[in-house]
């Protein structure tokens, strides 16, 4: 028997009185704002939706690598993750992720962390694709 467990919840709210594309978000106990940049007609009050998705991937990558390194007893002065969502003229999409680790990190540890990065929860969800069920309520 398959068991489904709730992993994350996010709620987005906007209304006629909200500035152009601004949306108030709630993720657990945290409140955020999403918006479009001024160049797209928004007020640039927060990240655009794809920025939020890419931020989630970057955060999950950095957190997972840090957890792994700490469990192994490895000291990492920093982990920087740069994620870019790209779309070609014909609509093909790709994500480029660049992870910067300390220069003095031994090659075998660097290789192991590269392998771990390929299996973070958000990486796997994006790669596998996730079925989305939409319900419209009054």
Language-model segments: residues:
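Extended beta-strand/beta-hairpin segments
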Residues: 1-54, 63-138
């Amino acid at each position: 028997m398959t068991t489904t467990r709730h992993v994350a919840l996010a709620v987005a709210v906007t209304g006629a009185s909200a500035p152009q594309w601004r949306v108030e978000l709630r993720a657990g106990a945290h409140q955020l704002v999403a918006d479009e940049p001024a160049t797209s007609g928004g007020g640039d009050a927060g990240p655009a939706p794809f920025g939020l998705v890419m931020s989630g991937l970057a955060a999950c990558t950095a957190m997972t690598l840090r957890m792994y390194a700490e469990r192994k007893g490895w000291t990492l002065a920093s982990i920087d993750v740069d994620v870019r969502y790209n779309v070609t003229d014909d609509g093909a999409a790709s994500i480029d992720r660049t992870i910067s680790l300390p220069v003095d990190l031994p090659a075998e540890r660097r290789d192991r962390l590269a392998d771990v990065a390929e299996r973070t929860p958000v990486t796997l969800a994006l790669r596998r694709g996730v079925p989305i069920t939409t319900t419209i309520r009054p």
